[in-house]
Amino acid sequence: MSQEKYGVLMVNLGTPEAPTPRAVKRYLAEFLSDKRVVDTPRALWLPLLYGAILPLRSPRVAKLYQSVWMDEGSPLLVYSRRQQQALAASLPDVAVELAMSYGQPALPQAIARLLAQDITRLVILPLYPQYSCSTSAAIWDAVARILTGYRRLPSISFIRDYAAHPAYIAALAASVERAFTRHGRPDRLIISFHGIPQRYAEEGDDYPQRCDVTLQALAAALDYPPEQVMMTFQSRFGRDPWLLPATDETMKSLPSAGVQHVQVICPGFAADCLETLEEIQVQNREIFEHAGGSTFHYIPALNDDAAHVDLLHQLVTAALRPSAPPPAVVSLASF
């Protein structure tokens, strides 16, 4: 009889514990100190970060968080916790933990809780549909560092990404079609992904290609002219060139091209957060309308939708199948 004990570690980026300047400063300091996120030499970056960026940005960003904060807390944490609870309910014999790369719930404690249950197989599920060195790889780095403190390790499966998984594409397509039914068919469907510095892509990060994989699969799944689907990149930070076209610049230019109705979906975000609820739904709406556009709708993230939970269930069960790579190896899966 098998003595296997399974565990799942779901990981998302992170969020401040409160919408206050102090909490935001603490969160941003941890996030922006990660070399996977900003790889500027530490001697140059850290004085700039602590001397200028954190003091200036923290109060402003705290106000933005206040505008989207839910009764239960940060939207990212609220929806991620619901995802964890729903996935755990669908996998009654599997220990399911949630962690954030930065902030709470913290990775070291989540891993400690899993290993305390003597699990023999661990699935690490980054909640990033498209791999990037600044997100998925940062989780790999952090988990590896934490595990150096343990003598006994389980076999580990790391889900690299799921950019083209059929259940993921189907869930996105259903979400878009619901929006079309509710708001009508737009002149353009904007698929906005979080951006990364262009240099990261030039140095080998295949994130742009993984975004394009999702774009092409989603466009093919929709009953909508593919030429009216546009991919853009948001959330630029710093002065380095980032992936183009930029979402905000696209919003400025569309009305002059005769586009009056846009709908925007952000498939790289597994849960709604500041970047979707404030940057897209508020800021980019204002940009579009100020430029002369008339109708703007944001299509929510998949969050804890049943189809999304089913996708997560499929990802985990595939990684735990007996046909998966045998114990004693670390496997990397991309769907």
From Swiss-Prot:
Which InterPro entries does its entry note?
Ferrochelatase (IPR001015), Ferrochelatase_AS (IPR019772), Ferrochelatase_C (IPR033644), Ferrochelatase_N (IPR033659)
Q: Which GO terms describe its biological process?
A: heme biosynthetic process
Tell me the superkingdom of the source: Bacteria
Q: Which reaction does it catalyse?
A: heme b + 2 H(+) = protoporphyrin IX + Fe(2+)
Which keywords does the record carry?
Cytoplasm, Heme biosynthesis, Iron, Lyase, Metal-binding, Porphyrin biosynthesis
Pathway in which the depicted protein is active: Porphyrin-containing compound metabolism; protoheme biosynthesis; protoheme from protoporphyrin-IX: step 1/1
User: Signal peptide span per the entry?
Assistant: none
- List GO molecular-function terms, semicolon-separated: ferrochelatase activity; metal ion binding
Keyword Metal-binding set for record: yes
| Key word Membrane present | no
Transmembrane segment boundaries = none
Residues that, per the record, bind Fe cation: H194, E275
**Record EC number:** 4.98.1.1
The cellular component terms of Gene Ontology attached to this UniProt record, alphabetical and capped at eight, are: cytoplasm
Q: Name one Pfam family in it.
A: Ferrochelatase
Q: Please state the protein's primary subcellular location.
A: cytoplasm
Give the protein's biological function: Catalyzes the ferrous insertion into protoporphyrin IX.
Classification via HAMAP family: Ferrochelatase
Per the similarity annotation, which family is this? Belongs to the ferrochelatase family.
Instruction: Specify the protein name.
Output: Ferrochelatase
The scientific name of the source species is Sodalis glossinidius (strain morsitans)
Gene transcribed to yield this protein: hemH
